[in-house]
Amino acid sequence: MDKLILSELTNGLNTVWMLLAAMLVFFMQPGFALVEAGFTRVKNTANILMKNFVDFMFGSLLYWFIGFGLMFGAGGFIGMPHFFDLSFYDGGGLPTEGFLVFQTVFCATAATIVSGAMAERTKFSMYLVYTIFISVLIYPVSGHWTWGGGWLMNGEAGSFMMETFGTTFHDFAGSTIVHSVGGWIALVGAAILGPRIGKYGKDGKSRAIPGHNLTIAALGVFILWFGWFLSLIHI
């Protein structure tokens, strides 16, 4: 009986801690929005803010619809889709719905990282297409390789990781699954789009394009610090 009570108490505390971390990561969304809006020109503020809303609004539904199954379903390279069905997942004592929320906010974070790198030169409709791809394919598949128990986490004898490196891959605090994925996509997007109009003169020298509000940009940075460092304690 004592072990049962202790187990239930542990699961309850773990659930509270997981949801607290999810709320902190979600709180990073307004941080990203403020940073990006503050460092861009006032005429593009509405576009930047709307893209951050779209990341979460559409991304959360799409991730729930198909992304969660691809990330945590059975399979080595990619999981099996389970459309709006969470019954396949065993949370190990944690509620599956809570874990879905936890993963959803990380998916939104990976998507939002790209927004700032392509600010002021991306059509809203094309950004919506990108949001769909990262929410239902890019983040879930790369996440399945590690957090979903895919081939990078396969520690069985004879597996690729064990034969090649003698150990499995370890992702610390989403440094690869979240930030590296978002960063690489941002790099590719910025390279394809090129610089903002007016950034370089005819002589090739760069011109400063100051943001319209450094105050809200600084506030956004502090919000990001707050959300990231406190959620890092959980991860």
Model-derived regions, located:
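Hydrophobic alpha-helical transmembrane bundles of multi-pass membrane proteins
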Residues: M1-I233
